[in-house]
Amino acid sequence: MEDEQPDSLEGWVPVREGLFAEPERHRLRFLVAWNGAEGKFAVTCHDRTAQQRRLREGARLGPEPEPKPEAAVSPSSWAGLLSAAGLRGAHRQLAALWPPLERCFPRLPPELDVGGGGAWGLGLGLWALLWPTRAGPGEAALQELCGQLERYLGAAADGCGGATVRDALFPAEGGAADCESPREFRERALRARWVEADARLRQVIQGHGKANTMVALMNVYQEEDEAYQELVTVATMFFQYLLQPFRAMREVATLCKLDILKSLDEDDLGPRRVVALEKEAEEWTRRAEEAVVSIQDITVNYFKETVKALAGMQKEMEQDAKRFGQAAWATAIPRLEKLQLMLARETLQLMRAKELCLNHKRAEIQGKMEDLPEQEKNTNVVDELEIQFYEIQLELYEVKFEILKNEEILLTTQLDSLKRLIKEKQDEVVYYDPCENPEELKVIDCVVGLQDDKNLEVKELRRQCQQLESKRGRICAKRASLRSRKDQCKENHRFRLQQAEESIRYSRQHHSIQMKRDKIKEEEQKKKEWINQERQKTLQRLRSFKDKRLAQSVRNTSGSEPVAPNLPSDLSQQMCLPASHAVSVIHPSSRKTRGVPLSEAGNVKSPKCQNCHGNIPVQVFVPVGDQTHSKSSEELSLPPPPPPPPPPPPPPPPPPPPLRALSSSSQAATHQNLGFRAPVKDDQPRPLVCESPAERPRDSLESFSCPGSMDEVLASLRHGRAPLRKVEVPAVRPPHASINEHILAAIRQGVKLKKVHPDLGPNPSSKPTSNRRTSDLERSIKAALQRIKRVSADSEEDSDEQDPGQWDG
């Protein structure tokens, strides 16, 4: 009874292996310093041995070693804050283990204990004000004390061991170092038993070559079968132990989900509680699915181990068949057939477990695709998910081919066994002896009955062979159908990959074009900003110039400056007139103004200005669309108001001829100096148009970008003359204009109509862009799902799917 293994580990404490082994000596380096803010000693311990070992391993593995989990990497440095009382307590523990340390511990001043009570806070400060304590040791004394503590800790590590000193100074968090959790202990024990059974089986398999006779080989086969059974038993226990927490989680998650659904159906809950319960149900569903996935993965790993063991046994047995003759090997044929059946069954189980995993992945991708409109509005994600689905579907087809292959192996093995039995039955020889008595004939009748029974057995075996042949034919038909579906899936996968490559190439090409466009736009924006900055600088220079030269500009406008040589005398005098002189504006939109001769056009002038010398009325024709521009340019072109005019000059000469009578040469010079284009026809007025910079010489001071610009105003101020500007004159209404005439005038001018898009109703093109994108995304998702359903319509829908338990016989 004492040697029996306990069924439960209740009340047992698992102890780590090698607990009392001789520990490795580590070279420790201690650093001690006084922390005045905390009133404690800062102690640091470095394991030089572990650090050097780690450096050597890093140099051996290369520049990029594989990362290890944090739990597997032991620390090589420790640090902590210890008060004077804490150091005395650690000294008492270490001195109890090694008495020579008693005289090595340095004397700590009592003032350090007071400094270590900084945690008392305000209360200690008040007591310190009432009864001030003595000053602590100086800086040199503290450094000497820290050096003594370093030497003491080094001696303690040599005498008591580095692990003991570390535990005394830096208590480790967690459980005791000599114990481990029961689950880890049991898992480690089962894994060790499984590894041991696997090693024993491999050792037996390697001993086949030592058997020189068939009898010895059969003994090896028997020992091998026992080793395999032990391996299967231990592996089953180990993997069942691994499956236990996931099965418990699946059961708990399913029960909690059912309870929540029952509560939602039966209880009267508020909306917030309903939302919370629905989220909790989704969380339990997710946990159950994760547990199922883990169970499937562990199952796949178990069958991988059994298949690997059986494959090794079968391969070694096939090698043994080459060493013996056919008659001697006939005794081992049943075991070979049994191994083939076992390997086929285990492979079927492995492939079906893989099929479950792939089906879960496929369903997960399909669920992501169906829930995509609520997550991401991107068609490229749909294409990527579809490509992933095709890849998993191709893997699933490969698994199904393996399943059909192993099913066919099962059928072929059973057919070979039945054919061998039929041949043995047919090859049986019956010898008949001559009969001398009639009674012996009765015995012959019994023998004939036995012969008939043998024929019935042969017929039954042949019927079973026919059934297996029909199953084999159905498997071949399934394989052909599956191959066609696989080819279709490959074609779809190749087509989608080609589309993805084309879209990537197209996007890269257009991305480069868009980058060029963005670069050009950025350069244009920078150019505009630079122009605006230069314009602001010019305006600032103009303002400063006008402020400095205000007096001189006033004298120039009063006629003290010489006339510009490029203008005629009359026109130059006209440009030097004060701002009170009127300028008549003729709009080409007015029909009455077009019909009046140029000399008789309406111009507003004061009586005093009519008698002045050289007063020539200037008529500027402004189109209707330029009225706004004239308003904006008026602010820049107007010079400051001049002072009162000087005394009148001597009597003027006879009045000059009208503007129409000017010579063509003077008109050309005037238009050239003003920078305007001459009218095309003399009988029809034209608006003054600014010349382009390309049509004028760059070195001319009078030719600038447009009339009224900053450069032109600056040049005019320098030469003491004001440029012509467009002035908006309000249209003079007739004195007795009726409402009907206004209406008729508006009708003549016309009304600009807006382009109205007709409402097309339920036409999808009239929907917003977001709705169109959403509909396009939904259509692409539906089309992808339809293609996926066509591809995934495989042998699962067949009604004659064979049950794995059918091949157990």
Swiss-Prot record:
GO cellular component term, pick one: Golgi membrane
Instruction: Output compositional bias ranges, type Pro residues.
Output: 638-659
Comp. bias regions, Polar residues: 662-673, 763-772
Q: Where is this region: Mediates interaction with microtubules?
A: 261-630
The tissues where this chain's protein is expressed are given as: Expressed in brain, lung, heart, colon and kidney (at protein level).
Task: Spell out the residue ranges making up region: Mediates association with membranes.
Answer: 1-260
> Does the entry feature the keyword Lipid biosynthesis, yes or no?
no
The compartments listed are: Cytoplasm; Endoplasmic reticulum-Golgi intermediate compartment; Cytoplasmic vesicle membrane; Golgi apparatus, cis-Golgi network
In terms of superkingdom, the source organism counts as: Eukaryota
The segment annotated Disordered runs over: 506-528, 546-571, 586-612, 627-707, 754-809
| Gene3D superfamilies referenced in this protein's UniProt entry, alphabetically | 6.10.280.150
PANTHER family cross-referenced by the UniProt entry: P300 TRANSCRIPTIONAL COFACTOR JMY-RELATED, WASP HOMOLOG-ASSOCIATED PROTEIN WITH ACTIN, MEMBRANES AND MICROTUBULES
Function text: Acts as a nucleation-promoting factor (NPF) that stimulates Arp2/3-mediated actin polymerization both at the Golgi apparatus and along tubular membranes. Its activity in membrane tubulation requires F-actin and interaction with microtubules. Proposed to use coordinated actin-nucleating and microtubule-binding activities of distinct WHAMM molecules to drive membrane tubule elongation; when MT-bound can recruit and remodel membrane vesicles but is prevented to activate the Arp2/3 complex. Involved as a regulator of Golgi positioning and morphology.
The annotated subunit structure for this chain is: Interacts with ACTR3; indicative for an association with the ARP2/3 complex. Associates with microtubules; in vitro binds to tubulin heterodimer in a 1:1 stoichiometry; decorates microtubules with a repeat of 80 A along protofilaments. Interacts with RHOD (in GTP-bound form).
From the Swiss-Prot or TrEMBL record, give the protein name: WASP homolog-associated protein with actin, membranes and microtubules
Originating organism: Homo sapiens
What gene is it encoded by? WHAMM
